[in-house]
Amino acid sequence: MKILLILVIIVFTNNFFAQKTFSSKSVLGHELGTEFSTHAQVVDYFEELNRVFPNNSKLEIYGESNEGRTLQLIFIGSENTIKNLEQIRNNHINTSVNENIPIVWLSYNVHGNESSGTEAAMETALILLRDKKEWLDDLLIIIDPCLNPDGRDRYVNFFKQYSTVSKNSNVRSLEHQEPWPGGRFNHYLFDLNRDWAWLTQVESQQRIKKYNQWMPHVHVDVHEQGINENYYFPPAAEPYHEIITDWQRKFQEYIGENHAKYFDANNWLYFSKEIFDLLYPSYGDTYPMYNGAIGMTYEQAGSGRAGTSVVTANGDTLTLSDRVEHHVAASLSTVEVAYLHKKELISEFQNFNNDFSYTYQSYVLSGDSYKLNALRRLLAHHDIQVREPKAGSVVKAWSYSSQEKTNYKIKQNDIIVFVDQLKGPMVKVLFEPQTFLSDSLTYDITAWSLPYAFGLNAFACVTELPFKGELPEPNEFSITPIPNDSKDAFAYVCKWNSMESARFLERLLSTNVKVKYAKKSFQLDGNLYEPGTLVIARGENSELNIDSLIIQASKGLELQMNTCSTGYVEKGNDFGSSSYHEIQSPKIGLLAGEGHSPLNTGEIWHYLEQRLKTPFLMSRPNDILDFGLSNLDVLMVPEGRLSAELVDEIMTWVKSGGRLVLFGESVENFFDELSIELTDQTDEFYEMSEREELSEMITGAIFNCKIEKKHVLSFGYDTYYTLRQSASRYTLNAGKAVFELPKNSKAISGFVGSNVIEDQEGALIVGQEQYGKGSVTYFIDNPLFRGFWSNGLLMVANAIYFVND
């Protein structure tokens, strides 16, 4: 007994001593707030923190970034809370169970070069564990110290390489001038704070899985802004989405009042109720809001120009230590407010997820199975349930395409997305035909309705619909779409109607299979095949084991493919006709570097590497000038500015047969050489107020397009809705406008300024023109925007494989 008592005393004494003497410097090699910590050091820090405070913390690795860096959470609470994490989680998710532990989730550094956030996360965790035990008795705090470790290390490594020993505070010093692309973005140059809902990036996918397992009551997204700005905290600016409750608004006022108390005591300046609104659903504040939490953004002066110290416009010196201190104060104040309102947080969260008094109760989605399955996979990531309807029943509904009420007869394979579920509010936000704007002055796009983004027919119903049952998440396909007698087949024909078709084509070309596409529609064995259909003839691949290669190329893909016993078609041109064009495997280049939009560059990069899975060459502008373009067939140019010398080099290459693909305003580099022109330009804004500017703007509105269906760029499209983010109107004097806005064009959804509503008729969306032996494709509205406009992906493949074939 005496020995046991001695052991208990020793363990207690050692734990007490360790907690009192925990040293950040001993782990990091520097005091917090004096230097930037690398991500490896951050991982070590939290491992040591968990070792020193084992009873009040649990460390969990939830994934890794594109570049293999650890994504982790630390759970902080009382000893009893940490022992019973799974029970607490189950009690919370099952809202019928009486729960008493609110969950506060603090997220830091979603933008890599806003790098004081992770330093603040380390300090906040230490203070909570060491000094705030009374809060831990009644709260569970989850900290994600770095949502974007690849971007953060990109910035931290730059700063360590170029900062002087004395840490020059002059903003013109090299250490304050990040090189392209900067640390804000992740590996693929995506803005992870715009990806919460769309989940195009692996970091987002892994984080959202963990988030939805916990569904916190409070979520804070910690950011930085320009070096001359004062600290921002809620309440947020209008517009608020209409589903945000009075309680969610009120809690933001509690937060603002409590933060102000601490900031006032330290004479720190701040602002609220401006700039940062609560509308676009893919932010780190709105996504939690639409899932019942109190979602908030905090913004500290800093970012990539700040370094560890910088002289601001008013002559003050902003230090890393200042930035960390402000974030720590706001973080701890958040936990305190949650502690003071813990009962309300629990009850109001439950109320939010039990109130579905929305206009539309069900959404019927109809379309090709691959589009429906792509949508279902996204919804499954968000834990949104989908139902199988009763085919043949007729429902009264609002039609997304006709923009009017109609009677719709439900088809086989249609799906129902319904609001009477835990994620019902999120369903409303993602599917509503039009988003209500309480204020048109907003921080981001104003339209995103998923049926338009995925190219699906949709019908919104005011009632809950009868159904057969719940539909599970679609499995990855493992299709072998080849009959047993395929070895006697004359050819294989595959419809061109999705990115699955494009990936299938790319796989075939990589194994030297000869593939042709149909320039015109044809009918065979009673099946109608539209232009773009792929034809793989056995006779043209006689030296290959074509059956085996097709089986391999089709694995994991959902394709509409058949075999045929003859090349003699029932309607249209026979397979030996010159109307079937052979597809060559293209050598693709992507222009990247200084002067180009990192975001648009990343969208194209991600598309080529992750969507299409094709090899390509990424080159800086100077490399093009040094080595030329003769080894490329296709050059993709993201938004940005080019030198006159580079424009000449590119146009010489196009004239000799190159295929140029231009995105957005990159077309303006070629006004002197090509027929495209800017016919209506937004007025200069410098003499206008912020609200006056709105009359000249389009802030992410959805329009229906007129399509030239005989052109190769339209292969695979019957309809297309574009997401316009600019009021500038481009037109082509030669070539072909393949997708354009029709007469009397009005926005289907989203905000359009009063002075530009009438100016959109005939606006070019996607077009193409010949230049010498080559061609130029224009994507004025970016079909790869943030990777979420799913129905835009195929037209980029059309530009790569079919244009100027």
Can you describe what each PLM-predicted range is?
Residues I3-F12:
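Sec-dependent N-terminal signal peptides
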Residues N14-A18:
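Sec/Tat signal peptide C-region and signal peptidase I cleavage site
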Residues Q19-I76, T81-S115, E119-T124, R130, ...:
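Intrinsic-disorder/low-complexity accessory segments
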Residues I141-Y155, E696-A701:
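Short, conserved secondary-structure transition motifs
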Residues D144-P149, F159, V222-E229, S666-V667:
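Short, solvent-exposed turn/loop segments enriched in Gly/Ser/Thr/Pro and often Arg
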Residues D153-N170:
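Aromatic- and acidic-residue-enriched segments that line the glycan-binding/catalytic groove
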Residues S169-W180, L320-A330:
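Short, compositionally biased "basic patch" segments
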Residues S173-W198, H219-P235, E299:
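Core alpha/beta catalytic barrel or barrel-like domain that forms the active/cofactor pocket
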